[in-house]
Amino acid sequence: MSSSLFRTGRLSALLLFLAFAVLAHAHPHVFADITVKALFDASGFTGVENRWVYDEMYSAGMMASADQDKDGKISKSEAKILESAILDPIKQQNYFNYVQAGTDFLKVSRIKNFKAELSKGKLVIDFVAELTKPVAADWTMLVVVVADPSNYIQMTTDMENADVQSPESLEVEYFADGLDGLSLFKAFRSEIEGLYLRYKKK
């Protein structure tokens, strides 16, 4: 078997594993600590910067498959393997980045700036999910949630320490709170918090 076919086979196995994880409604099998930053530019809301820190067991399994040269580090090519294995299967779930705008969720247009590293035995990934909502003269309100509704991956998102990056031309206010009363989030665990944002032109 050629090395390219071997790599393709390993990637396919990873994709199948992650696809099953997304579709399964079960007790959590993977654990990840999440931090987020809401991003704005002069045009308005532009996306969510994500940092996911996985548990040691999942990290070891992913590294065993993705670390092709077995040096315990993640090269650019190996990061590409991880990006495909982790994010491709959850594309239809909006990469677990749910942003309520009115009565709908915003759709992620693309993923950018993906990075991966191993830190103290844990796989850490960083990426930006691009979503857009233009600024207006009056307040625009959003609710940001990063979570797996199936709870196969238990994502603990620290919304109390979430951050916002915005230009001086915008006025942005935000706070963390529960999701009670928000019908779009009925399928989510009751303890999950959202980042409530409102913004307008100064």
Question: Where are these predicted regions, by residue range?
Answer:
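Early extracytoplasmic/domain-onset interaction patches
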Residues: 28-54
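Short solvent-exposed loop/turn micro-motifs enriched in small/polar/acidic residues
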Residues: 29-31, 91-92, 109, 190
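Short, hydrophobic/aromatic beta-strand segments
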Residues: 47, 60-64, 137-143
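Mature, soluble, non-transmembrane domains
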Residues: 100-202
